[in-house]
Amino acid sequence: MARVTDGIAELLGVLPEEIIYTSGASESNNLALKGIVQASRHVGKHIISTALEHSSVGGALSALQQQGCEVDLVDIRRDGTIDLEHLRELLRKDTVLVAICAVDSELGTVQPIQEIADILRDYPNCRLHVDATQAVGKTKLVLSGVDTMSIAPHKFYGLNGSGLLVKKKDLVIEPQIHGGGSTTPYRSGTPALGMAMSIEKALRLALENQNERIAHVAALNRLLRAELAKYPKVRFNSPENAVPHILNLSVNGVKGTAFQQELGKNDVCVSVESACSVEGTPSKAVYAVSRDRKNALSSWRISLSHLTTEAEIAEFLQIFDRCYRELAQ
């Protein structure tokens, strides 16, 4: 286990003792948020986050609000990134946590993590948590100035039910699972060696082949954008500088669920909102960017990977054309 942990730490550029094994990003996010805030009661109870976060972050924040914490959401700009000036305005002496996703799961927007970390240097009692679930293998990971970072291996072809929390060595957080500290005092329970080995292998493949994989996916994304832009009712929600693996779009006047169902009849799988959202509600991320509820309800997401082929894109475009003619005209 020590050798595997050393390998993971080396790949991420952190210390082995900064690696905490979890059951997934949901547990990692809960451990980080609750652990930081509960260990910082003597400083304050003010938290800053965004409307773009995964439901495990939103759920943890709701639980902390019930414990007396105050949560402010930083504004989102039209390009999907957070408003850094508004972040500066929200920061207070009693702010103990800023929780931001590195890459938004619905739009693919890359957040300015380094700039956020630089701003927080003037607030030594405030910790920065980054949910990097959608970032690994898709963009450069920023760890400088980050106190905790959640990683979900199943997003880069690791196993479901496995996760990591990278925690800065000197940071003290409150454990959420108590018992014997076999590998860390912050999360009781003995991690499975096979799970750890699968994380190391998947992480190594994702990072060592990252540039080649990104270039392939970016070419497919450009092809999709060029062809889909020919349809007058198509509106792209993902910004141009989003990770190429995620392309969010709307077809004006057609609910995203209707397109999802019609494409599904042709064995094409697309997503409406994030996987853990409440069914029937508009996409929080798309609404935050477009300020348009109808557009948010019409939005859906195409996911690409290094395994996606040009032939699959060509077949998808043929199927999309038939669905568009049936639903949008």
Predicted regions located by residue number:
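Pyridoxal 5′-phosphate
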Residues: 1-329
